[in-house]
Amino acid sequence: MALYYDLPVYKDVYALIRELFVCTSNFSQAYKYSLGQDIKRDGLNLVRSIYRANKHKDKLPHLEAFLDDFELLKLELRLCSDLKLISTRKHAELSVLLSSIGKQVTAWRNAQVV
């Protein structure tokens, strides 16, 4: 079992969280303590799920939890883009990272099902 912080998906999720904290710090007060807090919390939940999936023998429940939180985070970021809280360019940059993370976790989950 690899250490969770050596996993490529962990490194990508960590990079995403750093970006999320930077992006949400620029939100207006109306959104910073509602949508911004939810985004940061959901990002941190992703790291917890990676840690737990790597730690436990039965990885599937943790990977499924990750994918659930991941979909919510994608929705929140799309809402931010629609509300002009983040630029279209920043949303595109985050989408590339999200796509990479999604592919890695989906492949990991599919490997557990077989």
Residue spans for each PLM region:
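Amphipathic alpha-helical assembly/interaction segments
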Residues: 1-114
